[in-house]
Amino acid sequence: MLRLLVFTSLVLYGHSTQDFPETNARVVGGTAVSKNSWPSQISLQYKSGSSWYHTCGGTLIKQKWVMTAAHCVDSQMTFRVVLGDHNLSQNDGTEQYISVQKIVVHPSWNSNNVAAGYDIAVLRLAQSATLNSYVQLGVLPQSGTILANNTPCYITGWGRTKTNGQLAQTLQQAYLPSVDYATCSSSSYWGSTVKTTMVCAGGDGVRAGCQGDSGGPLHCLVNGQYAVHGVTSFVSSLGCNVSKKPTVFTRVSAYISWINNAIASN
């Protein structure tokens, strides 16, 4: 159930079956963060039996709304979000547990065609989050903002710490500078798999997203402020941390109008 798209569908786009996107991301090559370093980060969890399990990340964008990846909520399951969490396996005393009341997936999302984009969803919570030093709203970029190449960014999440490894118990972060579209869409990188509605970051072969990071934020520093410019979407099927295969994110600035309309109409 851990999600981070592995691009299994890339063969449909002229790629060999040995290198395709995978949608189950976690932070590889990262470090544990101190508590409340990224207070807009949430853990999206699904219920199985009487227990809850982490499946994806997400960002609190309104007191009753969370932004995540569409592929995280494809299945018909019962979800909740955990805000203010740090260690998934213990009670930090700062958590807020809120049920997901409604899931709004982008209408153009197609789980059989990840390369088309639209890997974004917003979740309406059953009650409003209480904002404090551990739970804050994420800052979204202005509509249409394009990151300059090598913009400082951090991915955060509880995803696997290495390809085929275990989930992290404490929240991790990894420095992933942005890779501009011209570079990321070149033949030696992702080629035509990457679209202008996506953001690439990393690709050094050391640090990356991995299974369990999906849906979580890419925090980028622009004009002195960190904003959530990406929603973690997919990595290469060859592994999470493959050189010249940056982690790929949904570009939040391409969907600001959709986000606002989805919230207003739901």
From Swiss-Prot:
Needed cofactors, names only, are: Ca(2+)
Give the UniProt subcellular location, in the record's own words: Secreted
UniProt source species: Bos taurus
Q: What gene is this protein a product of?
A: CELA1
Catalytic activity annotation: Hydrolysis of proteins, including elastin. Preferential cleavage: Ala-|-Xaa
The cofactor binding remark recorded in the entry reads: Binds 1 Ca(2+) ion per subunit.
Q: Name one GO biological process term.
A: elastin catabolic process
Which Pfam families does the protein's record reference?
Trypsin
GO CC term (a single one): extracellular space
Q: Which family does it belong to?
A: Belongs to the peptidase S1 family. Elastase subfamily.
Protein known as:
Chymotrypsin-like elastase family member 1
Main function: Serine proteases that hydrolyze many proteins in addition to elastin.
